[in-house]
A protein has these predicted regions:
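Substrate-contacting helices/loops that form the catalytic groove of nucleic-acid
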Residues: 175-210, 268-280, 284-291, 301
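Glycine- and Gly-Pro-enriched alpha-helical subdomains that act as flexible
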Residues: 72-111, 242-344
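Flexible, glycine/charged-enriched surface loops at secondary-structure junctions
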Residues: 57-65, 164-167, 230-237, 267-278, ...
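A structural signal for short secondary-structure junctions
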Residues: 57-58, 111-114, 226-227, 328-331, ...
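C-terminal binding/interaction regions
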Residues: 117, 121-122, 135-165, 170-172, ...
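Active-site-proximal loop/turn and secondary-structure-junction residues that shape catalytic pockets
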Residues: 70, 125, 237-240, 342, ...
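Active-site loops and adjacent core secondary-structure elements that bind or stabilize anionic groups
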Residues: 1-199, 214-232
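Conserved helix-loop functional segments at active or binding sites
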Residues: 53, 227, 264-268, 353, ...
Length: 392
């Protein structure tokens, strides 16, 4: 099949709509269940490239959680700690595979943004991954294969209408790609830039101690950015993107947005948050929203008399601004990547507040000396990759 008819395009008024192969060849994917839409397939094909490249670059199973053609999260398949299992709502007795861990971590970083996500897996979807996904609100999934048990589990989602797409893992697109805007065709070479450890050798900071785990984190950050709407900045810890700032017009706003998301992720591990006692019948999305509000400056919205009883068994103590600041200050060893150069040292200053020790960015600003000096002030490791990663 070289074409797939869709219900509509980006919006219901945009008809007709389809995806097809210009050269008349067969589509490199098959729809195993459901009826994916235009934006679903944009998410699917962008997210597949991300996880495929992550797997190639790190040798680890990789997963992503996409919304509106940008990743809400991405991660490689490292084991979950007991705290991870608690904040990601994982059954302590569940048997987890590496690919399941990768998706749980990818989705867990920003659970509000991942509500109704598109999931992407570098490896075959197994029953462990499907079982976790079954209880989450999600629009669809793309993977190179599915076990029989996993497919049966996924087919029960959304009253049997959950979108399941299988991609040919060996498919390679043409070297040149096209896009029509206002009736005009744009042509460019596909972004086939390989991101690997060789890109991280130009360390321009005084501190040149870049351990292997930080190299993996830099690779995760850069590949995530390669498939994030620009401008974009990504914070990573232990192979997991913990904050993605996408589609901002200024670099510092990207750095702030991604940093705030990284802070929110870390605040969910605060002892007061871990001790929250939720009512027995609370839904996962309601629990996610409650945690998000509780850790924000709007905490009274869930703690007011007559309100907290809907969510908690016991009224929680306020997580004060001082407690939040002190907790975030304990975060260390974080990596930040940027899809274009940092024009000023203020980006480094903001990144430091979220525990950043390692920075990967292209370099090339007329103020590179100021950026380097700011990194040196805090003993950070700064690598200039020489590669811009804009994505539109």
């Amino acid at each position: 099949m070289n074409a797939l008819e869709l219900k509509y395009g980006c919006n219901p008024n945009q008809k007709p709509s389809r995806v097809f192969m210009r050269d008349g060849s067969d589509l490199p994917f098959a729809v195993l269940n459901g009826k994916p839409g235009y934006i679903n397939l944009l998410d699917a094909l962008n997210s597949w490239q991300l996880v495929k490249e992550l797997k190639t670059a790190t040798g680890l199973p990789a997963a992503a959680s996409f919304k509106h053609v940008s990743p809400a999260g991405a991660a490689v398949g490292m084991p979950l700690s007991d705290v991870d299992k608690k904040i990601y709502f994982v059954d302590p007795a569940a048997e987890l595979t590496p690919i399941a861990c990768a998706y749980i971590r990818a989705r867990g970083v920003d659970r509000l943004c991942s509500y109704g996500d598109w999931a992407a897996l570098s490896d075959t979807c197994d029953a462990a991954t499907a079982s976790y996904l079954k209880d989450e609100v999600s629009d669809g999934i793309i993977a190179p294969g599915y076990t029989d048990e996993a497919l049966e589990i996924l087919k029960t989602k959304k009253m049997g209408n959950y979108n399941v797409v299988q991609i040919d893992p060996d498919y390679l697109p043409a070297a040149t790609e096209h896009k029509d805007v206002f009736g005009i065709t744009f042509e460019q070479g596909r972004n086939d830039l390989v991101i690997d450890k060789d890109m991280l050798t130009n360390i321009v900071s005084e501190n040149k101690d870049l351990p292997e785990n930080a190299k993996i984190d830099m690779i995760v950050a850069l590949i995530t950015l390669k498939y994030t709407q620009s401008n974009s900045v990504c914070y990573v810890k232990d192979g997991q993107a913990i904050g993605v700032g996408a589609g901002q017009q200024s670099r510092i706003h990207c750095t702030r947005l991604a940093g705030q998301k990284a802070d929110n992720w870390y605040l969910r591990q605060h002892p007061k948050v871990l001790a929250l006692q939720f009512v027995d019948d609370i839904r996962r999305p309601d629990r996610d929203n409650a945690i998000d509000v509780y850790t924000s400056d709007e905490y009274e919205d869930v703690l007011a008399d007559g309100v907290w009883q809907n969510t908690f068994k016991v009224r929680p103590e306020v997580l004060t601004a001082e407690e939040k600041k002190a907790w975030i200050a304990t975060q260390t060893g974080v990596t930040v990547g940027s899809d274009a150069f940092f024009p000023f040292g203020d980006n480094v200053e903001r990144a430091r507040k979220s525990g950043v020790t390692y920075i990967a960015e292209p370099g090339g600003s007329i103020r590179d000396d100021h950026v380097i000096a700011t990194a040196d002030k805090y003993g950070m490791v700064l690598a200039f990759t020489g590669a811009r990663l804009f994505h539109h």
